[in-house]
Amino acid sequence: MDTAVDTHPPETKPRYGLELLAVLSVSFGLDGITALLSFIRAQVTINHGLGFSKVATGPIKEATKSAYQWLDILDQVVSILGGVAAAFLAIVLLMRSPGGPGLGVGLDRLRSREVLQGLGFAALIGIPGIAFVYVARRLGLNAQIVVTNFPDVWYRVPTLLLEAVQQGIAEEVVVAAYLLTRLRQLGWTNSRALATESVVRGSYHLYQGYGGFIGNAIMGLVFGWWFQRTRRVVPLIVAHAVIDAASFVGYVYLHGRVSWI
């Protein structure tokens, strides 16, 4: 039997392990987990499915309901991990080039000051953003968006909060930290890179209408400007997560009670 000879230095193995995990997380690794959960759900349906549960009572019916709920929770967790996977891959790629402490994007350690800065950014962007959404809706610049259609279950709010954190990590690590870092390394000027980052951020919000593009492009300019001057991404993650958390949870409790939401 042939034996593979490992000629790579030992210090590269952890990096290769992270790289392998990152690639699988954005491709077939999480797909496999999702397929496994679907398979388990199918087996539960076959054994204790809709036809059976109509006549099932007591412990059997409750156990079936509980199984479906836990499968749904696992589905949500896998979905959130899938959203963070792109950020994980971006971090692994940043590790391949010298960037100083925290990969040159401020991921070395969490500072309490940065959390406060993030909360300040959330207020700076979020409060005018509410007025902007209202005006845009009145002018017909924004589409009517269903922020979340998550069913009314006990784990709805915790899941929405985790989704908000996932969005903050994914967007700010990829669009702010990774994109602006690589554009700088390609020799782009700050203004050109900032404009590109702003357009990219606005573009994937076009489903919200013109207002969604404009609002997020402005957010991109502010966040990108901050990152270019500080090289710290954590305040942006905090701000983005807080804004999205307020949007998601606010929609749950205000939709149908406030006419323009």
For the regions a language model picked out, list residue spans one by one.
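N-terminal, membrane-interfacial amphipathic/helix-forming hydrophobic leader that caps
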Residues: 1-104, 249-261
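Membrane-helix interfacial "entry" motifs
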Residues: 8-15, 64, 68-72, 106-110, ...
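Residue-level signature of transmembrane alpha-helical entry/exit and packing/kink sites
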Residues: 15-23, 72-80, 114-118, 156-160, ...
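Transmembrane helix-loop-helix hairpins at the membrane interface
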Residues: 29-32, 126-130, 134-261
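Generic hydrophobic, helix-prone segments enriched in Leu/Val/Ile
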Residues: 36, 40-44, 73-74, 111, ...
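Generic structural microfeature
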Residues: 100-103, 110, 114, 178, ...
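Short, hydrophobic secondary-structure boundary micro-motifs
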Residues: 101-105, 144-147
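Interfacial segments of alpha-helical transmembrane regions
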Residues: 104-127
